[in-house]
């Protein structure tokens, strides 16, 4: 899996009214269906047990690695306490190329979550360790550093509404 052209969507956009990180993700032939990767999902769940289901119930379509990246980036932010709920993976016209969009509350946190999600996927593929507690701590620390405080945030939000 290769991630290219990561960009921040800083307002209402094609995908959502919320801010989001958009990435172009290239998957190898084997990564187009994670069911074809023996033991991958079990290793992934061992590394990140709180990860949401990789496929909705009743959906029997192949789940590409890009979708795993999407759910991992969203899940890492949510576990770190960020108020995020939206993500989407859409195939492009080119086989194996996907657009991955993940909501963020703070841009730096969203970008870091995408990087950490890549590391998580790579660790699950390689059957290597992944420091989940460290990753969540990193995201929480960054979120606290860049997020506006409650009173400043209220002032900024009121100004934006005007």
Task: Walk through the language-model features, giving the residues of each.
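Preference for protein termini
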Residues: 1-162
């Amino acid at each position: 899996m290769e991630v290219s052209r990561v960009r921040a969507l800083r307002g209402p956009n094609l995908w959502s009214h919320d801010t989001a990180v958009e990435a172009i993700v290239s998957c190898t032939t084997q990564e187009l269906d994670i069911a074809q990767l023996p033991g991958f999902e079990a290793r992934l769940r061992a590394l990140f047990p709180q990860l949401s289901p990789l496929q909705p119930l009743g959906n029997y379509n192949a789940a590409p690695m890009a979708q795993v990246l999407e759910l991992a980036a969203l899940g890492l932010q949510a576990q770190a306490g960020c108020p995020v709920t939206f993500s989407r993976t859409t195939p492009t016209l080119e086989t194996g190329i996907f657009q991955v969009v993940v909501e963020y509350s703070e841009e730096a946190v969203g970008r870091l979550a995408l990087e950490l999600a890549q590391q998580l996927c790579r660790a699950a593929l390689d059957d290597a360790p992944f420091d989940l507690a460290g990753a969540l701590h990193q995201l929480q620390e960054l979120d606290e550093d860049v997020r506006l405080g409650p009173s400043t945030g209220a002032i900024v939000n009121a100004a934006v509404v005007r």
